[in-house]
Swiss-Prot record:
Naturally occurring in which organism (per UniProt): Rhizobium johnstonii (strain DSM 114642 / LMG 32736 / 3841) (Rhizobium leguminosarum bv. viciae)
Protein name: Serine--tRNA ligase
Molecular function per GO: ATP binding; serine-tRNA ligase activity
UniProtKB keywords: Aminoacyl-tRNA synthetase, ATP-binding, Cytoplasm, Ligase, Nucleotide-binding, Protein biosynthesis
Residues involved in ATP binding: 262-264, 349-352
Binding site for L-serine: 231-233, 285, 385
Pfam families membership: Seryl_tRNA_N, tRNA-synt_2b
Length: 427
């Protein structure tokens, strides 16, 4: 959420930032709504002040035995008490209306973010590795998995409908190995604290990370009103909600390996075959809680941590700087890691690492106490996939495919595979 004081002082800057994102100007309507709210607040404060003063004057009038003045003041206090509830209700309604409007405004992009409309305007920041060179034809992951006999979409559909997958035998183990490798890397070498947290959260949590109120249709909700997490970003970031941290203890770095649940409401007709776009998938999430000064450097560090996963797996990938039109709602700057999929003859997103400024900190009322001036400031937050496990599985299948249809296990995963070095067709 943006600071209304900043919007009041910088209306042109807000509208310019919204224009970069392809959104309509909002500063004028927000400032007008804020003026109405502030007027209602002032009215309520004036009435309260006059009521309190009149109450004191009653005592003085009584002490002076001026009963006529005392009665007049009592009548005034009574009238003020009658007026106050309506003014206070107006204040509450206008405050709620303003907060709702602010909660639907996207974050302000950094100045160095390329301006663009969609993914076609993203910039290649760096490319790592090379495409595999084979004598045999590449295949898509679902062709490989089904031919091996360990990837079953038909039974998954019988259980749950479309956009689900059943993995068995060595493919199930490979998925588990990938997730375990990621968690081990980030905790043992990258300094992240592993967290086991709930998969269902309250409204306040998804509001804090900015999925609510704007993106409710992308989420799954339980009958008792809780939300299935679309990413562990929600739980990891909200660990510090309503807290005041010491600046000396920052940054906090959390990681979790969890299922994620997404309705894919806007994805009809996209990636309908295979595992690329699922309602339920495993993901290793990275979250950092920092002060204002450290956030940009932390963003580069987090992205490097995610890249290291792909480097150690020997996968060809590129890092993209997203343009303003392709960035997430809460982001100030985002790097996407796109892994090469030979079967699709294309790069596909496997990780997204974003720096959010104090956008989420303000929504969560999460603050830190400055080590010098001791004032409380909103924390800055970052999140990234380190990485999406299912998409990593896809990349391994397509990049480590052998001519006979078997799949070689990447060396870094061998300690997790119980002696298995290759996945071959089921007997």
């Amino acid at each position: 959420m943006l600071d209304i004081k900043w919007i009041r002082e910088n209306p042109e800057a807000l509208d310019a930032a919204l224009a970069k994102r392809g959104a309509e100007p909002l500063a004028q309507s927000l400032v007008a709504l804020d003026e109405k709210r502030r007027s209602a607040v002032q009215k309520a404060q004036d009435l309260l002040s006059r009521r309190n003063l009149a109450s004191k004057e009653i005592g003085a009038a009584m002490a002076q035995k001026n009963s006529e003045l005392a009665e007049k003041l009592k009548a005034e206090v009574s009238e003020l008490k009658t007026l106050l509830p309506a003014i206070e209700e107006e204040d509450r309604q206008l405050t709620a209306e303003l907060n709702d409007a602010l909660s639907r405004i996207p974050n302000i992009p950094f100045d160095d973010v390329p301006v663009g409309k969609d993914e076609h305007d993203n910039i290649v920041t760096r490319t790592v590795g090379e495409k595999p060179r084979w004598n045999h034809a590449p295949k898509e992951h679902f062709e490989i998995g089904e031919a091996l006999g360990y990837m079953d979409f038909e039974r998954a559909a019988k259980l749950s409908g479309s956009r689900f997958t059943v993995l068995t035998g060595p493919l199930a183990r490979l998925e588990r190995a990938l997730g375990q490798f990621m968690i081990d890397l980030h905790t043992s070498e990258h300094g992240y604290i592993e967290v086991s947290s709930p998969l269902m959260v309250r409204d306040e949590a998804v509001y804090g990370t900015a999925q609510l109120p704007k993106f409710a249709e992308d989420l799954f909700r339980t009958t008792d009103g809780r939300w299935l997490i679309p990413t562990a970003e929600v739980t990891l970031t909200n660990l510090v909600r309503e807290e005041i941290l010491d600046q000396e203890k920052l940054p906090l770095r959390f990681t979790a390996l969890t299922p994620s649940f997404r309705s894919e409401a806007g994805s009809a007709g996209r990636d309908t075959r295979g595992m690329l776009r699922q309602h339920q998938f495993w993901k290793c999430e990275l979250v950092s809680i920092t002060d204002a000064e450290s956030a940009v450097a932390e963003h580069e560090r987090m992205t490097a941590c995610a890249e290291e996963v792909l480097k150690r797996l020997g996968l060809h990938f590129r890092t993209m700087t997203l343009c303003t039109g392709d960035m997430g709602f809460g982001s100030r700057k985002t790097y996407d890691l796109e892994v090469w999929l030979p079967g699709q003859n294309a790069f596909r997103e496997i990780s997204s690492c974003s720096v959010c400024g104090d956008f989420q900190g303000r929504r969560m009322n999460a603050r830190y106490r400055g080590k010098d001036d001791k004032s409380n400031k909103f924390v800055h937050t970052l999140n990234g996939s380190g990485t999406a496990v299912g998409r990593c599985l896809i990349a391994v299948l397509e990049n480590y495919l052998n001519e006979d249809g078997s799949v070689t296990i990447p060396d870094v995963l061998l300690p997790y595979m119980g002696g298995l070095t290759k996945i071959e067709r089921a007997a």
